[in-house]
């Protein structure tokens, strides 16, 4: 243990503790910009500079460890002035048109600039004349980047993709796509973790709010919107509402207020996904010799992009079931169009998703109907719909609750937990057990697949089918480890759930940003609690899904179901060629 003094307060901490963490342990806050604990501790921004007695130079607190007897001053006049100088230097190479930035009001640089009262003009502006690329779901804006390296470290250490890298040397050094190429030419999964960990507006999702506003204003369009499970756990964070109050039904009211004609729940097609994917698993499991193993879930588009580029030998192991988002669009433009007696081309389908990769998924050539129209017309992230609410002056705190529209508005507890890591596996096993035995298991029988561990495994016995070995992973880093272990023959599973983002969709790349705070666990808890308190907790008991099969699809894995609800993962290619 080491004892030191910080701002006159004695503190004892373990050896190798940084000055920053030692200060935080006694509630002394040192400002940071580039720092991410355990991921980016490189002192790049120098905002966390502190003064250590006996040392001639100021030192960054994030990457300097404590020593016995050290005396630290975190807010001396010398320190404050150094921080102001560093902020001015950052601002000289930063596009300060804050009113045009989606991160305005939620930007670490903007906050620090205000905190240090940096008003008026600063150093001479030195912006780069590089055109920005708006052709992908993830957008990088050169003159908003502060070169903090967070995106590089997240992509490398957490997601193991290495998409971002430092480019150039000296003062022109910047961040760009590695090996140089455009983002669209890379094997980026568009998971969006670089976006949610950017402290400023240097990285953001492609903004599609204008398309939705145009559709809402078009009297010839019938606007249909779906809300993903994980969105209900995060949509009202900007408005500081308690999750218990910020219900999905209040969001329905907000969407109706905006002018959407029909508001449905993606939970409906999450249940439908379980019926198709669960039936597919049973078919494969009971005819093992006909298939490759293990079977992988396919509802996460970031994961699908990952396996196609990194482990193409396993593309055939993916479930052919479309994601709930895409199933919804397909059902709306067929079954619902028939129910409403309207031309499917009049239907404009909007998805509200916790995910940036969903934008890429909706644009795939394999996600179109026989007429060539997309299943889903526009995908909005949670952040985008919040901006739309703000623009429409909608205050969720004063809204009443409105039920989802019928017939695509009912979802079970099993569907809700699609938004948390382990939820798809849990839901699938609940219904697979029933489809084999004709009896429901305890809805919490498969709790071993829940929780925030990045790689979980379990074995369950389904009477009449045998032992089922399963695994659940979240984050592409954990996924790479699992895939390497499978390829090496070190592990053997029957069914694997993969989510590209740590913690699953609850921590998705399209969710609200809380700088340096990971929200996936608490949002996941919200979803598991909804499941626990829902009367119907099995996807196969969704009466609207049952009616859809009876009236239209006939049966899981049937001809019409295969046409509408399944896809060919070999029908499109990643830039790497697979």
What residue ranges belong to the model's regions?
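Short structural boundary motif marking the start of a folded domain
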Residues: 1-4
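Short strand-turn-strand beta-turns centered on an Asx-Gly dipeptide
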Residues: 6-9, 53-54
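A short N-terminal beta-strand-loop micro-motif at the entrance of redox/enzyme domains
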Residues: 9-15
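Residue-level recognition of alpha-helix initiation/capping sites
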Residues: 14, 136, 146, 189, ...
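Iron-sulfur-associated redox domains of electron-transfer enzymes in respiratory
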Residues: 15-75, 79, 205-578
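Fe-S ferredoxin-like electron-transfer domains
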Residues: 46-190, 196, 203-222
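Structural motif corresponding to the C-terminal cap of alpha-helices
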Residues: 159, 198, 336-340
């Amino acid at each position: 243990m080491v004892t030191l003094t910080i701002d006159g307060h004695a503190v004892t901490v373990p050896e190798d503790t940084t000055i920053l963490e030692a200060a935080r342990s006694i509630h002394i806050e040192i400002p940071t910009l580039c720092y991410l604990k355990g991921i980016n501790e490189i002192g790049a921004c120098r905002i966390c500079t502190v003064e250590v007695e006996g040392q001639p130079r100021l030192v960054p607190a994030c990457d300097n460890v404590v020593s016995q007897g050290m005396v630290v001053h975190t807010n001396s006049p010398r320190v404050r002035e150094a921080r102001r100088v560093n902020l001015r230097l950052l601002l000289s190479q930063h596009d300060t048109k804050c009113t045009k930035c989606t991160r305005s009001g939620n930007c670490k640089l903007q906050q620090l600039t205000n905190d240090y009262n940096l008003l008026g003009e600063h150093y001479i502006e030195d912006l780069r004349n590089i055109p920005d690329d708006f052709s992908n779901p993830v957008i990088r804006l050169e003159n908003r980047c502060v070169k903090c390296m967070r995106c590089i470290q997240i992509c490398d250490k957490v997601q193991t993709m290495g998409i971002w890298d430092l480019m150039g040397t000296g003062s022109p050094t910047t961040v760009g796509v590695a090996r140089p190429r455009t983002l669209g030419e890379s094997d980026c999964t568009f998971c969006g973790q670089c976006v949610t960990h950017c402290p400023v507006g240097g990285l953001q999702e492609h903004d599609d709010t204008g398309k939705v506003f145009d559709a809402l204003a078009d009297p010839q369009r019938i606007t249909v919107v779906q809300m993903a499970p994980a969105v209900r756990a995060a949509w009202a964070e900007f408005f500081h509402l308690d999750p218990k109050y910020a219900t999905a039904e209040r969001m329905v009211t907000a969407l109706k207020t905006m002018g959407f004609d029909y508001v449905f729940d993606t939970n409906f097609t999450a249940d439908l996904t379980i019926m198709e994917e669960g039936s597919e698993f049973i078919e494969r499991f009971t005819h093992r010799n006909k298939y490759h193993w293990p079977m992988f879930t396919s509802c996460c588009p970031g994961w699908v992009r990952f396996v196609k580029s990194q482990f193409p030998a396993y593309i055939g192991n993916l479930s052919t079931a479309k994601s709930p988002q895409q199933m919804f669009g397909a059902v709306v433009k067929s079954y619902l169009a028939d129910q409403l007696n309207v031309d499917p081309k009049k239907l404009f389908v909007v998805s509200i998703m916790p995910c940036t990769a969903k934008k890429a998924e909706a644009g795939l050539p394999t996600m179109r109907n026989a007429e060539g129209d997309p299943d889903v017309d526009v995908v909005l992230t949670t952040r985008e719909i919040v901006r739309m609410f703000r623009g429409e002056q909608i205050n969720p705190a004063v809204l009443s609750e409105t039920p989802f529209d019928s017939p695509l508005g009912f979802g079970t507890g099993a569907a809700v937990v699609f938004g948390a890591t382990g939820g798809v596996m849990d839901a699938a096993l609940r219904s697979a057990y029933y489809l084999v035995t004709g009896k429901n298991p305890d809805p919490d029988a498969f709790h071993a697949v829940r929780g925030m561990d990045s790689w979980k495994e379990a074995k369950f016995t389904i009477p009449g089918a045998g032992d089922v070995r399963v695994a659940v992973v979240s984050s592409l880093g954990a996924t790479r480890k699992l895939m390497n272990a499978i390829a090496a023959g070190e592990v053997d599973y029957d069914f694997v759930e993969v989510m590209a983002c740590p913690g699953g969709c609850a921590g998705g790349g399209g969710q609200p940003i809380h700088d340096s705070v990971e929200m996936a666990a608490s949002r996941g808890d919200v979803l598991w609690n909804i499941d626990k308190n829902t009367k119907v907790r099995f996807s196969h008991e969704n009466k609207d899904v049952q009616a859809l099969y009876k009236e239209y699809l006939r049966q899981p894995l049937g001809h019409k179901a295969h046409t509408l609800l399944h896809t060919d993962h070999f029908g499109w290619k990643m830039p790497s060629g697979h």
